[in-house]
Amino acid sequence: MEIKDQGAQMEPLLPTRNDEEAVVDRGGTRSILKTHFEKEDLEGHRTLFIGVHVPLGGRKSHRRHRHRGHKHRKRDRERDSGLEDGRESPSFDTPSQRVQFILGTEDDDEEHLPHDLFTELDEICWREGEDAEWRETARWLKFEEDVEDGGERWSKPYVATLSLHSLFELRSCILNGTVLLDMHANTIEEIADMVLDQQVSSGQLNEDVRHRVHEALMKQHHHQNQKKLANRIPIVRSFADIGKKQSEPNSMDKNAGQVVSPQSAPACAENKNDVSRENSTVDFSKGLGGQQKGHTSPCGMKQRLDKGPPHQQEREVDLHFMKKIPPGAEASNILVGELEFLDRTVVAFVRLSPAVLLQGLAEVPIPSRFLFILLGPLGKGQQYHEIGRSIATLMTDEVFHDVAYKAKDRNDLVSGIDEFLDQVTVLPPGEWDPSIRIEPPKNVPSQEKRKIPAVPNGTAAHGEAEPHGGHSGPELQRTGRIFGGLILDIKRKAPFFWSDFRDAFSLQCLASFLFLYCACMSPVITFGGLLGEATEGRISAIESLFGASMTGIAYSLFGGQPLTILGSTGPVLVFEKILFKFCKEYGLSYLSLRASIGLWTATLCIILVATDASSLVCYITRFTEEAFASLICIIFIYEALEKLFELSETYPINMHNDLELLTQYSCNCMEPHSPSNDTLKEWRESNLSASDIIWGNLTVSECRSLHGEYVGRACGHGHPYVPDVLFWSVILFFSTVTMSATLKQFKTSRYFPTKVRSIVSDFAVFLTILCMVLIDYAIGIPSPKLQVPSVFKPTRDDRGWFVTPLGPNPWWTIIAAIIPALLCTILIFMDQQITAVIINRKEHKLKKGCGYHLDLLMVAVMLGVCSIMGLPWFVAATVLSITHVNSLKLESECSAPGEQPKFLGIREQRVTGLMIFILMGSSVFMTSILKFIPMPVLYGVFLYMGASSLKGIQLFDRIKLFWMPAKHQPDFIYLRHVPLRKVHLFTVIQMSCLGLLWIIKVSRAAIVFPMMVLALVFVRKLMDFLFTKRELSWLDDLMPESKKKKLEDAEKEEEQSMLAMEDEGTVQLPLEGHYRDDPSVINISDEMSKTAMWGNLLVTADNSKEKESRFPSKSSPS
């Protein structure tokens, strides 16, 4: 931490309280008024005024339990007297434990529930010839922003670095200054009156300067946004009015009907020398002190603040910054500065109850909850500024922030500061420049461990959360009843059915729909084309479009997880090829046998649903998921590049080009020298002969259809050279990939407003496709385009839309079909459930639950329907589903400056999937539009989807570690807990399995691919012998244990909890010399009192107090 100007800073801001003045207030409430109250008048009051401690009648004071306070704090409350320097006596009760106790208590009212805080630091500014005013110099939502020296702009948000000395001085201010908790006030004037009355009563402020300090506090506040908004149309007045109206029910209206105590009004003016009873609590109302001499009335203050044109009477609001403040946030105002007429420091910490909108005090129109006032003599402005930064930074600390809301007295606040000091990290002064602004981190560590007490074994009392989510939950528990899991899925998803449609009203859903429609169209049509080639047109592109649309619509409407996108898979295509070849060799009807197999497969899948077989998904861990997902992503990338290279066969390049012979290059269509029998038969059917055809006048497509030959220097192998088309296709391909990735990252760009960046990022891929289509159309190069069937009818005329399972095949084929159906069932089950597991991971923070059984049922039913109609089978597509989820990610719209938006979850709805497949079915009628989309653009989209889906896969992060020195490796959580050699061993095993899957996938044995995916589960089980359970918990998900093992673990946990409870009930008595068994456990409050810095503060304070007692001020109270 920063330590500077120590000579000036060693002088304390406040003298320490001694026995003659006041003992450090260990009570919950102190009245600043010298008025006698009866006990029954004081009980049950919430307002706390922590100030002077004056014993009554020589009676030894004791702490009393408040009716709404803590119930178990006797050991702290019964310490009535402290040391002269304000320190508590040594104790093993550490600040961390006290803070955990404070945060663990629950108040009966909602008034002390913590809210988000906006903190503003204002400093009083004096200029010659001008009236003084409060100027905003810094603000905090999460990180610090300063007004730059020029005063024209805000700095970038940065992590606040504080000097240790300023934190010590802040602690001294809270210990010895005025602390007013739960003050009832409606205006800044009332707050100033109460604070100054407290200061005068306690002898911290002279009566003759009270009026001048009050005037200083009433000075107008000038905020940084006022200058740049001064000339704008005051439309923002309505926004301020909204904030005012939201706050008035909690401020003016609530207090309007309060009855002022008959003793409270004259208390300040007349009874200043009376002795107040300890624990006195006074409910100050808005009329308190309003008639005192020298005070400015609220009306007078309003007249002074409302100078200027009418449109400036309501302060301008920075709407852009206002959007970053969370709903329900409150303000804490820090007021520091130098006053020439002060000879000692005025310090006050105020908590309002309820929070009140103080017009003109904060930059934004939100209710103020806390005020910290620090005014002192000239010459210590920088010191005051650093203390103001310290309290503002503390207010942004998650733990102290909660302590400030729940504190019952001064000691609670001091404990919060001590706990903060116990957690801070100190930077050596010789190795760090404090003027360097630290950039906000991308991820801020959780502070929950600071709030939860620890048990003897070092873990949190409430248990340590798993490092990452597995697949446990009610969705995967066996019910023991037929269709029990399916019934629970329906009950779980039914309440969200209508919200699945309402939640889709967002531009993000429109962007996702347009992007994925283009992404899904091409593979469906391509798959149909390949299937048509393999089955001689029995199932082709039109059947593929119709089947995908029908299956997708049904699944999107009634599926358990509508975020899953259905598509075609490679193993299905391999199975279709093998089946067609088998039927052709044995003279069987392919479509009929396929229908029988499909119906058996659907029946077996329904049996799996009835027996809750989806509960076996819990054995699919991250190890299997990542291997499967990585393979599919790599296949997408590989096939995209393969399709691009295949264009070189259709549009070849002359690799032996000679620029000097360009005038001699030509390519002509000639009669084939030796036409094949098929060619001659085709000519005869068309009533043509070789002599009837004028070969030299034929176009390229006509020459190809008549099986002519290309002759000439500009001809390749069966095609003319077309270099511009291939090169242009390559340009389109890589431009699509680059532009998609760039626009997707545009959300984090520094250009344009946030809303524009967000829209561009959501529509990134669609905008890319649109731009590439326009550019391709403008250039005019005939690149290959998307071909969509233009007529809705079966590809072959000899088949209809329905197929009988038996057909012309023998009867026994229906029974024999169960054998290949078993293999198909494994294929469908593994593809569907692994994809569902990836989509339903806890990292996605899905709130509407999942439905593994319902998903499998819908896939099984539609598989049976597609089999009867002779349509392709569709199952969950991994990459398309991951892309769908990534396109619907939700992030916090209201994030503090410098804070990374928080991932909130996924926009769960059914509309995007539904619209994708509805439009896909309508594509037959949109061929006039779709024919403009170049195929290289869609190949580029495939590559982008495959590459973007690899992000977040831990396997590739671990692969990078092989080439990184240890000192340059990222701070992955598993590297902290698992030896690097074990991490590498885990990665090698996973890469070996991935390589084996790849070999099987691209070979003729691709039909057994699902069996190999299933084998990964057993490989993972064998890894229990190579790695410990703890190592696997960090590198992978833990697999379910046997019932006996679970019972043993439960017994061990119960024993540990019993030991923890016994330990909590044990009373530890310190030995002589305060010996501690564990040297790592210290009390920061006790250790701080032993430091020379704190001691110097106390010694100087005592000297200052002694000097003041020798030469008392005339106006100081007796």
Curated annotation (Swiss-Prot):
Domain statement: The N-terminal cytoplasmic domain is likely to have a high level of intrinsic disorder.
Membrane association type: Multi-pass membrane protein
TM annotation in the entry: 510-530, 539-559, 563-583, 597-617, 627-647, 721-741, 763-783, 810-830, 856-876, 913-933, 936-956, 999-1019
Skewed-composition ranges (Basic and acidic residues): 77-90
Lineage of source species: Eukaryota, Metazoa, Chordata, Craniata, Vertebrata
Disruption phenotype: Homozygotes are born at the expected Mendelian ratio but most pups die around weaning. When fed soft food from the second week of life onward, most pups catch up with the weight of their wild-type littermates and survive. Adults display normal weight and lifespan, are fertile and do not display major behavioral abnormalities. However, brain ventricle size is drastically reduced and mutants show diminished Na(+)-dependent recovery of pH following acid loading of choroid plexus epithelial cells.
Function of the protein: Sodium/bicarbonate cotransporter which plays an important role in regulating intracellular pH. Has been shown to act as a sodium/bicarbonate cotransporter in exchange for intracellular chloride. Has also been shown to act as a sodium/biocarbonate cotransporter which is not responsible for net efflux of chloride, with the observed chloride efflux being due to chloride self-exchange. Controls neuronal pH and may contribute to the secretion of cerebrospinal fluid.
Keywords of the record: Antiport, Cell membrane, Cell projection, Glycoprotein, Ion transport, Membrane, Phosphoprotein, Sodium, Sodium transport, Symport, Synapse, Transmembrane, Transmembrane helix, Transport, Zinc
UniProt modification remark: N-glycosylated.
Cellular compartments per GO CC: apical dendrite; apical plasma membrane; axon terminus; basal dendrite; basolateral plasma membrane; CA3 pyramidal cell dendrite; dendrite; GABA-ergic synapse
Record-listed Phosphothreonine modification sites: T94
Glycosylation site positions: N677, N687, N697
Principal subcellular localization: membrane
Residue intervals on the Cytoplasmic side: 1-509, 560-562, 618-626, 742-762, 831-855, 934-935, 1020-1118
Keyword Membrane: yes
NCBIfam families: ae
Tissue expr: In the brain, detected in cerebral cortex, subcortex, cerebellum, hippocampus and medulla (at protein level). In the cerebrum, expressed at high levels throughout the cortex, at lower levels in striatum and not detectable in the corpus callosum (at protein level). In the cerebellum, detected at high levels in the molecular layer but at very low levels in the granular layer (at protein level). In the central nervous system, detected in neurons in the olfactory bulb, cortex and cerebellum (at protein level). Within the hippocampus, abundantly expressed in CA3 pyramidal cells (at protein level).
Full protein name: Sodium-driven chloride bicarbonate exchanger
Segments for region (Disordered): 1-23, 58-97, 269-310, 457-476
Membership in a protein family: Belongs to the anion exchanger (TC 2.A.31) family.
Basic residues composition-biased segments: 59-76
Induction conditions: Repressed in the brain by chronic continuous hypoxia (at protein level).
Effect in UniProt of substituting H977L: Reduced recovery of intracellular sodium-dependent pH
Localization in the cell: Basolateral cell membrane; Apical cell membrane; Cell projection, Dendrite; Cell projection, Axon
Impact reported for E893A: Reduced recovery of intracellular sodium-dependent pH
GO-annotated molecular function: active monoatomic ion transmembrane transporter activity; sodium,bicarbonate:chloride antiporter activity; sodium:bicarbonate symporter activity
Catalytic activity: 2 hydrogencarbonate(out) + chloride(in) + Na(+)(out) = 2 hydrogencarbonate(in) + chloride(out) + Na(+)(in)
